[in-house]
From Swiss-Prot:
This is Adenylosuccinate synthetase. Belongs to the adenylosuccinate synthetase family. One of its GO terms (cellular component) is cytoplasm. It catalyses: IMP + L-aspartate + GTP = N(6)-(1,2-dicarboxyethyl)-AMP + GDP + phosphate + 2 H(+). It is found in: Cytoplasm. Pfam families: Adenylsucc_synt (PF00709). Gene3D superfamilies: Adenylosuccinate Synthetase, subunit A, domain 1, Adenylosuccinate Synthetase, subunit A, domain 2, Adenylosuccinate Synthetase, subunit A, domain 3. PANTHER family: ADENYLOSUCCINATE SYNTHETASE (PTHR11846:SF0). It comes from the Eukaryota. Substrate binds at residues 294-300. GO terms for molecular function: adenylosuccinate synthase activity; GTP binding; magnesium ion binding. The keyword Methyltransferase does not apply. The keyword Nucleotide-binding applies.
Length: 421
């Protein structure tokens, strides 16, 4: 049976930790979409692991891992990340990771183009990670991209990459990019990549009877190309639909859809953020939560939990259970606000607006809850939480239409987790 872990907000919710927990009993862990723009941090045995394109299931020694068809793979980053994991003690990691031959190749060229496209946007920048994800997906949609399987074929990458570079040069003029160097490196990758590349259809068929398949979502619903705060989104489908499509999953095999919700809100980069706190509250959340992007190192924008957004996310992803993360970051607040509705021009909005400029204008309606002013870090049992912390969790459950909060994160370590059964 399949369990899917999805971000319910703007990303950085802490998906890696619940994935790590669930992967201990999983036989297969998969990434369905996105690329090395994603960032997951896991602390295990006092060692911090940073994941970008690789699935977090690599930490568990019995878990096989797949980078699926819906992803874009920057090959140098794939090997760099794999080497970093092995250097930290995951010696057999390279024996348990595979890539779909239908995944797209993200070139250094795409990163150069990403920067040029952002520069053209000037004051209306999307705020991308600069990793080339958008241009890579654009080339995929335009049917001129390169698939991972084609890297193994002699001469294919070189001819396609030269054509891509020529096209971008016609568009942007001279590029600060070494075409010959990238061509040379992919000659080497042709052999080096071969042990990792699989036919995903055959691979998934082989694992069709696997008792436990875990899908690790990247980014989050509000960054989805269709359902997110467009155009301030990533270039892939980050929700339930993207997971099914990117891994050719049988929908009837899905047992659990885990929505990961941070106990407050954060966002990296540009785009609307109705509950953002550009004040002492935001600074306190940023400082206490150490809110810096794993991929970019950028300071995350911080604000109160937004239940309008979370309900919208739930309506699209159909969560069966919630993992609430970083509850301990709210320990020192006298009172905690939660957004429960939006108004525009004095009228209550019935749904989450599609237009980014409308989201910038909404008036947020909050409910104020009392804080608990006591330490919850490291708590592992529900009864160990202060009464007001329990009430905060129960309030969120009600606002989510009764979707149960099964796991509550209370710190960075693997065992800093409450499981409510």
């Amino acid at each position: 049976m399949v369990t899917i872990v999805l971000g319910a907000q703007f990303g950085d919710e802490g998906k890696g930790k619940i994935t790590d927990l669930l992967s201990q009993s999983a036989t297969l862990c998969c990434r369905a979409a996105g690329g090395h723009n994603a960032g997951h941090t896991i602390v295990h045995d006092d060692i911090t692991y940073d994941f970008h394109i690789l699935p977090s299931g690599l930490i568990s020694p019995d878990c096989i891992n797949l980078v699926g068809t819906g992803t874009v793979v920057h090959v140098p980053s794939f090997f760099k990340e794999l080497d970093a994991l092995k250097a930290k003690g995951l010696k057999d990691a390279d024996k348990r990771i595979f890539i779909s031959d239908r995944a797209q190749v993200c070139f250094d060229l795409h990163s150069v183009v990403d920067g040029l496209e952002e520069a053209i946007l000037a004051g209306k920048k999307v705020g991308t990670t600069g990793k080339g994800i958008g241009p890579c997906y654009s080339d995929k949609a335009s049917r001129r991209g390169v698939r991972i399987g084609e890297v193994l074929e002699k001469g294919v990458v070189e001819s396609k990459l030269r054509a891509l570079e020529a096209g971008y040069r016609r568009q942007f003029g001279e590029l600060k990019y070494d075409l010959e160097d990238e061509v040379k490196r992919f000659h080497e990758y042709r052999t080096k990549l071969q042990p990792y590349v699989v036919d995903q259809m055959a691979f998934m068929h082989k694992h069709r009877s696997s008792p436990s398949v875990l899908v690790e979502g990247a980014n989050a619903l509000l960054l989805d190309i269709d359902h997110g705060t467009y155009p301030y989104v990533t270039s892939s489908c980050t929700g339930l639909g993207g997971a099914i499509q990117g891994l050719t999953l049988n929908p009837t095999s899905i047992k659990s859809i885990v929505g990961v919700v941070k106990a407050y809100s954060t966002r990296v980069g540009s785009g609307p953020f109705p509950t953002e706190q550009n004040n002492a509250v935001g600074e306190k959340l940023q400082r206490a939560g150490r809110e810096f992007g794993v991929t970019t190192g950028r300071r995350r924008r911080c604000g109160w939990l937004d239940m309008v957004m979370c309900r919208y996310s739930n309506a699209i992803n159909h969560y069966t259970v919630i993992n609430l993360t970083k509850l301990d970051i709210l320990d020192d607040f006298d009172e905690i606000k939660v957004a429960v509705a939006y108004q525009l021009d004095g009228k209550l909005l019935e749904s989450f607006p599609a237009q980014a400029d409308v989201l910038d204008k909404v008036e947020v309606k909050y409910v104020t809850l009392p804080g608990w002013k006591s330490n919850t870090m490291g708590a592992t049992k529900w009864e160990h939480l202060p009464t007001n912390a329990q009430r905060y969790v129960e309030f969120i459950e009600r606002e989510m239409g009764g979707v149960p909060i099964r796991w509550i994160g209370t710190g960075p370590a693997r065992n800093h987790m409450i499981e409510r059964i």
